Amino acid sequence: MSDNGATMLSSNRIANSFALVVALAGGAVCLGPARADGPSFDCRKASLPVEKAICADPRLSAIDALVAEAFTGFEPAFGGDKRKIARALIADRNACGQDAACIVSAQNNALQTYGNAPSWVQDYNIALIGKKALDTAARHPGSLDQPLPSSIGQCALTHITALTTRLGDDPLETAGPEAGSLARFSNGGAGVSYEREPGLASSKAGDPVVMCLISISRDCPQGDERGRVYYGVDLTIKGTWVLPDSQHLCGGA
């Protein structure tokens, strides 16, 4: 991952992916290639709920095969143990159970970590997690704040408390694009961008939001846990974003 979050999806890509949410809800969308030769493991021996979910879905199977392939060429950026990093990523995936949005988020995070994330996987990730975010809002209308998500694929309701430039010194609505963006939320979360984030540009303090954790950096210097990435949707204006919670990802300045 880049230091300033440049691996995040572009605003246009996010908007296009969000447009797929409605189609996904109706079961009328097909994204990207799906391999016919199954996942990286023997489905006859699948025992975990996540393994059974992957085996039952050709697209999840294709993504699993991509993860296994990407791992072979992976070299840790900070001298960490390659297999230890992989075990942490697999644990993230296994914790998802049969939740497809969670599984794809965890697998896309693994592909990002290994340096080989196809655009269709990223788009599929945002489409699924976007649908899950709206489903979360529908199940809890008018709900009070929920705790900041702590595991990949988890979503929670919250509210915007402040919208400023990246350094927090000016209101976002009157700032130029070069000043960046910083959103703070009532559950203690944040979203930071070096650019003027279109998904937040028309938002207001007090707007209800659903945040979903989609990435936890695993290839990091010891003790550096910066750079968790969240998908967010403003439930008032339906603006969306994908942003890290700090100016620098782990290993950065």
Task: Give the residues covered by each predicted segment.
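Cysteine-centric segments in proteins
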Residues: 120-253
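N-terminal targeting/docking segments
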Residues: 2-5, 31, 189-190
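N-terminal alpha-helical modules
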Residues: 34-164, 179-180
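Selective for proline/serine-rich intrinsically disordered segments
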Residues: 7-8, 31, 37, 145, ...
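Bacterial N-terminal signal peptides that target proteins for export
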Residues: 3-21
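C-terminal segment of classical bacterial N-terminal signal peptides
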Residues: 24-34
